[in-house]
Design a protein with these regions (language model features):
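Short, Lys/Arg-enriched N-terminal segments with co-localized hydrophobic residues
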Residues: 1-11
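Sec-dependent signal peptide recognition
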Residues: 13-21
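C-terminal motif of bacterial Sec signal peptides marking the signal peptidase cleavage site
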Residues: 27-29
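Bacterial signal peptide processing site
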Residues: 31-33
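Structured, acidic catalytic/metal-binding patches in enzyme active sites
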Residues: 36-39, 48-257, 261
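A conditional alpha-helix N-cap/helix-loop micro-motif detector
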Residues: 41, 72, 266-270
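Alpha-helical scaffolding within the catalytic cores
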Residues: 44-49, 273
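A cross-kingdom marker for long, charged
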Residues: 255-317
Length: 317
């Protein structure tokens, strides 16, 4: 697939990069939160939206981000107020599953393993590049998404992209919800693991090829996090629309392959997330629904889907 990318030129290369970035962001989540010195107030109000129906009933939609950057003292007053007044606080999945749940989901780590797919040579190339994989040939027994998670914890990636695995926004929200005892899942970890397993058979080689471009991995992670912490929502809007526009320009066979990937990983989930929020409003609840910010934006993002259904979507910044 790497040769295919080079032959097809910049459009295909950019498209694959954008699609792979979706995976990198999605499966690098579930970090931990701990007390750190120099904690600061993080303004996330530009990613907070009040969603209302024609009767004025509303819930909140929030775009979160899995990797963190700065120690968190609190979020801005607007977001904190929305959290405080919400009946339930939703995130994509439980950050601290029970031992039984953990045992259930770990079985997915070996489905479509690198070894089973005959891709050990590509994994060996990654071992040479990333300290988190160095000297660990046994990790070929896992699938590509486990390897991706390990790469997202690689010391060089964390350092150069300015990532802190202890300061994630969604973990702050999760702990807030645990104190209020009102946490709910939008999807659940097992759902996400099944989804990734479904993708891993057909797309592992492509993902491994892109992970081999360490410079791109670091650059993409840094750009995404820079955009979030600077409140640049237009970055995500442009990125998602560029991806969709480039999908339309592919030949039929490539278009079918990558549209399937996009639908499974993003669009179908966007619809489910939109429906979760709509159900909240319909049931007269004031809920706070936080999902990865990339799900919110673009022509097929949650915000546009809600507008298409007649909801008023207002940024709280």
């Amino acid at each position: 697939m790497y040769v295919l990318v080079r032959k097809k030129g910049n459009k295909m290369k950019k498209l694959v990069k954008l699609i792979i970035v979706l995976v990198l962001v999605m499966v690098s989540g579930c970090t931990t939160q701990k007390k750190e010195e120099n904690a600061r107030i993080i303004d996330t109000s530009m990613f907070l939206y009040k969603v209302s129906n024609q009767e004025g009933k509303y819930s909140y939609l929030f775009g979160t981000f899995h990797p963190g950057r700065y120690p968190i003292k609190s979020l801005d007053k607007v977001t904190e107020k929305a959290l405080d007044e919400s009946d339930s606080i939703y995130l994509e999945c439980d950050m601290k599953p029970s031992p039984k749940e953990t045992e259930e989901i770990t079985k997915y780590n070996t489905y479509n393993s690198i070894r089973d797919l005959g891709l050990e040579d590509k994994y060996e190339n990654l071992m040479k590049q990333y300290k988190s994989l160095k000297g660990k040939p046994g990790y070929a027994l896992y699938n590509v998404f486990v390897i991706n998670s390990l790469i997202n914890s690689d010391p060089e990636v964390l350092n150069k992209a300015n990532i802190s695995k202890f300061s994630a926004i969604d973990n702050y929200i999760y702990e807030y919800a645990q104190k209020k005892k009102n946490f709910k899942e939008v999807e659940g970890i097992e759902f996400q693991m099944k989804l990734l397993t479904e993708l891993s058979g057909d797309y592992s080689e492509t993902i491994l090829d892109n992970l081999a471009n360490k410079e791109m991995v670091i650059k993409s992670a840094k750009e995404d996090l820079d955009a979030y912490y600077s409140g640049n929502t237009q970055y995500y809007e442009d990125e998602q629309n560029l991806l969709l526009n480039q999908l339309e320009q592919l030949n039929d066979s490539d278009k079918e392959k990558y549209e399937k990937y996009w639908d499974i990983l993003a669009y179908n989930r966007n619809i489910h997330m939109k429906d979760t929020l709509a159900d909240s409003i319909h049931n007269n609840k004031h809920d706070f629904i936080g999902v990865g910010c990339k799900h919110l934006y673009g022509k097929k993002g949650i915000i546009q889907l809600l507008k298409d259904d007649g909801y008023l979507v207002e940024c709280m910044k």
